[in-house]
Amino acid sequence: MNQTAILICCLIFLTLSGIQGVPLSRTVRCTCISISNQPVNPRSLEKLEIIPASQFCPRVEIIATMKKKGEKRCLNPESKAIKNLLKAVSKERSKRSP
């Protein structure tokens, strides 16, 4: 093999090995763009999701799905009102479980 062919093979190998670690999708990010500090009535909740911090999003996210219209709201986990909501929901769940 001549030197040009060897050089081309090496360049192709280096290029392909560099591509291996690149993620295919760049859409991984935090779910919540803005957060609300407003209190939420636990009776109006259909679902409450708590998403822990991860390598893709550095903050804890709390997503409340409302019964009416299925509206989703991102709640501030540091807000006193939201902390009280989490306590109320936790207390309600512990009453229901045997």
Swiss-Prot record:
Citrulline, modified sites: R26
GO MF annotation list: cAMP-dependent protein kinase regulator activity; chemoattractant activity; chemokine activity; CXCR chemokine receptor binding; CXCR3 chemokine receptor binding; heparin binding; signaling receptor binding
Biological processes per GO annotation: adenylate cyclase-activating G protein-coupled receptor signaling pathway; antiviral innate immune response; blood circulation; cell surface receptor signaling pathway; cell-cell signaling; cellular response to heat; cellular response to interleukin-17; cellular response to lipopolysaccharide
Main subcellular localisation: secreted
Endoplasmic reticulum listed as a keyword: no
Keywords linked to the UniProt accession: Chemotaxis, Citrullination, Cytokine, Disulfide bond, Inflammatory response, Secreted, Signal
Signal sequence, renumbered to the chain: 1-21
Subunit note: Monomer, dimer, and tetramer. Interacts with CXCR3 (via N-terminus).
Protein name according to UniProt: C-X-C motif chemokine 10
Organismal lineage: Eukaryota, Metazoa, Chordata, Craniata, Vertebrata
